[in-house]
Curated annotation (Swiss-Prot):
This is Ribosome maturation factor RimM. The gene is rimM. Keywords: Chaperone, Cytoplasm, Ribosome biogenesis, rRNA processing. Pfam families: PRC_RimM, RimM. Belongs to the RimM family. It comes from Bartonella tribocorum (strain CIP 105476 / IBS 506). Coiled coil: none annotated. Its main location: cytoplasm. Disulfide bonds: none annotated.
Length: 181
């Protein structure tokens, strides 16, 4: 595993390393990509510190995989990798997204606004606790909120203009009573 801090500037979060599997250095990896089969084709992966990871073997299971990385030869070495986030460089991505697909990293920083143009805040992150993706919004008040990342709550994304439209009712930002303060 080489160390290269410069490589972190243009990264896309792709996976997280889980528990060891067996005694030969294999680990479970949760892949965040829509197509786990492509995981190995991305080539070299990087962690938060810029260390590189090269996949030697990979077996997929739904959105997870059992992976052996170069230089990880036993269970002890595999255990030391648990919890590491893996990134791929942007130029390594296969750019065949459909019109309604986005990389999460591209949405961070977009303005969040209502249909009428009122700016509510900006996208500052994503979460997924098992029931679907949630957008983390930093409201103009400084407060952070999680809203469902669905067509109902987020009916429109305008990447070129730098904003997305949110339906405040569907997103849970307002209750049933209109409150225009």
């Amino acid at each position: 595993m080489k160390y290269n801090k410069e490589k972190l500037k243009n990264k896309v979060y792709l996976a997280i390393i889980g528990m060891p599997h067996g005694i030969r250095g294999d680990v479970f990896v949760k892949i965040l990509s829509a197509d786990p089969q492509r995981f190995k084709s991305y080539g070299t992966l990087y962690d938060d510190m810029g260390r590189s990871y090269e996949i030697v073997t990979l077996r997929t299971q739904k959105n997870n995989a059992i992976v052996r990385f170069k230089g990880v030869e036993n269970r002890n070495a595999a255990e030391s990798l648990k919890g590491i986030h893996l990134y791929v460089m942007r130029d390594q991505l296969i750019d065949d997204l459909r019109e309604d697909e986005f990389y999460q990293v591209d949405l961070i920083g977009l303005r969040v606004q209502e249909y009428g143009g009122k700016i509510l805040g900006e996208v500052c992150g994503f979460c997924n606790f098992g029931a679907g993706d949630l957008l983390e919004i930093r409201l103009n008040t400084g407060k952070r909120m999680l809203i469902p990342f669905s067509k109902v709550a987020v009916p429109e994304i305008c990447m070129d203009s730098g904003f997305l439209i949110v339906d405040p009712m569907a997103a849970g930002l307002r209750d049933g009573e209109e409150n225009d303060q």
